[in-house]
């Protein structure tokens, strides 16, 4: 049987459920190697070492940030020597895994990550060297997800992002920017910017509810109004039509701003004044369940 590598976020090294699930697969005859991350860059190094182990699948065991780091390293490998991606959701929000209908039960998720059908999915590339598999968020949404305290995440899980956002409404400030892409141009002040390959962010909020991960397109949604924010956020996260929510789909877009703005790429912040974001169609293979709603 082909070899599999599990890259496990260091925070989960002592997780007994993970250890049990790994043992069960090994008892079935699966050759499953495990590497634990300690610091930034470990996941990339483990991915690069995977070729020497004749690995067919690399499993990202952690949250959205871990998945991002593994996927970003995979796309850098030659296509002929690129393992498939498996996902073991162990984070706070697990936005990408949840929207893909990957089970949150550790044993079920690990079985899927090893034995599931591999399908081609898109990645999004930012400024030629950064990537996201799920979503890039800007504006108020970025500040919520990057500033939510770890203790609040531990207690409340995905809901912590929304609650922390309510607590921080006094800090709301729009980002002035220009956005253009094929057949689309807009300039103004945006409270929330969502650029989705996947659909949800911030602990289960469907910011880009129509996005697909294999259509060669990104869904862009902008919240531009200055009216009462709670009502607007309800519209954004529920998918309701609202004149202050602008949306489109496009294969690439460019964003320019007179000042630094910060985007959250699957949980990882990236700041600058100029961004080019484009889809890489069929970038990697990912093991997903048959009922994954993000496949067109």
UniProtKB/Swiss-Prot annotation:
**Hydrolase as UniProt keyword:** no
Q: Which parts pass through the membrane?
A: none
Choose any GO biological process term that the UniProt entry carries and state it. Answer: phospholipid biosynthetic process
State the family named in the UniProt similarity comment for this chain: Belongs to the diacylglycerol/lipid kinase family. YegS lipid kinase subfamily.
The protein's name in its UniProt record: Probable lipid kinase YegS-like
Read off the lineage from the record. Bacteria, Pseudomonadati, Pseudomonadota, Gammaproteobacteria, Enterobacterales
Organism the protein comes from: Yersinia enterocolitica serotype O:8 / biotype 1B (strain NCTC 13174 / 8081)
Question: Annotated Gene Ontology MF terms?
Answer: ATP binding; lipid kinase activity; magnesium ion binding
Xref: SUPFAM superfamilies: NAD kinase/diacylglycerol kinase-like (SSF111331)
NCBIfam families, sorted: lip_kinase_YegS, PRK13054.1, YegS/Rv2252/BmrU family lipid kinase
Localisation: Cytoplasm
Pfam families referenced in this protein's UniProt entry, alphabetically? DAGK_cat, YegS_C
Q: Where does Mg(2+) bind?
A: 212, 215, 217
Q: How is the cofactor bound?
A: Binds 1 Mg(2+) ion per subunit. Ca(2+) may be able to substitute.
Q: Which cofactor does it need?
A: Mg(2+); Ca(2+)
- Function of the molecule: Probably phosphorylates lipids; the in vivo substrate is unknown.
Q: One GO term of the cellular component aspect?
A: cytoplasm
InterPro entries, per the entry: ATP-NAD_kinase_N (IPR017438), Diacylglycerol/lipid_kinase (IPR005218), Diacylglycerol_kinase_cat_dom (IPR001206), Lip_kinase_YegS (IPR022433), Lipid_Phosphate_FormReg (IPR050187), NAD/diacylglycerol_kinase_sf (IPR016064), YegS/DAGK_C (IPR045540)
| Active site per database record | 268
Q: Say which domain of life the source belongs to.
A: Bacteria
Enzyme Commission number(s): 2.7.1.-
Positions of the DAGKc domain: 1-130
């Amino acid at each position: 049987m082909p070899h599999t590598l599990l890259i496990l976020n260091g925070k989960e090294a002592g997780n007994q459920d993970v250890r049990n699930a790994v043992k069960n697969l090994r008892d079935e005859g699966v050759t499953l190697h495990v590497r634990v991350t300690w610091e930034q860059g470990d996941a990339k190094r483990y991915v690069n070492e995977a070729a020497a182990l004749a690995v067919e699948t690399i499993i990202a065991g952690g949250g959205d940030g871990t998945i991002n780091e593994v996927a970003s390293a995979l796309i850098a490998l030659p296509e002929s020597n690129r393992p498939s991606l498996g996902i073991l959701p162990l984070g706070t929000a697990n936005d990408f895994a949840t929207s893909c209908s990957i089970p949150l039960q550790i044993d079920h998720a690990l079985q899927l990550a090893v034995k599931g059908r591999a399908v081609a999915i898109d990645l999004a590339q930012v400024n030629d060297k950064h990537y996201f598999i799920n979503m890039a968020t800007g504006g108020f949404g970025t500040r919520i997800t990057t500033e939510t305290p770890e203790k609040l995440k531990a207690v409340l899980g995905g809901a912590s992002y929304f609650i922390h956002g309510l607590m921080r409404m006094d800090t709301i400030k729009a980002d002035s920017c220009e956005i253009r892409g094929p057949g689309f141009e807009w300039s103004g002040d945006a409270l929330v910017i969502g650029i989705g390959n996947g659909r949800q962010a911030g602990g289960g909020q469907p910011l880009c509810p129509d996005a697909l991960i294999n259509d060669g397109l990104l869904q862009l949604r902008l919240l531009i109004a200055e009216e009462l924010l709670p009502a607007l956020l309800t519209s954004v996260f529920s998918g309701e039509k609202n004149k202050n929510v602008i949306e489109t789909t496009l294969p690439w877009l460019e964003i320019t701003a007179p000042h630094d703005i910060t985007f959250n790429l699957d949980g990882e912040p990236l700041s600058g004044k100029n961004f080019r974001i484009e889809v890489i169609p069929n970038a990697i293979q990912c093991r997903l369940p048959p009922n994954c709603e993000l496949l067109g």
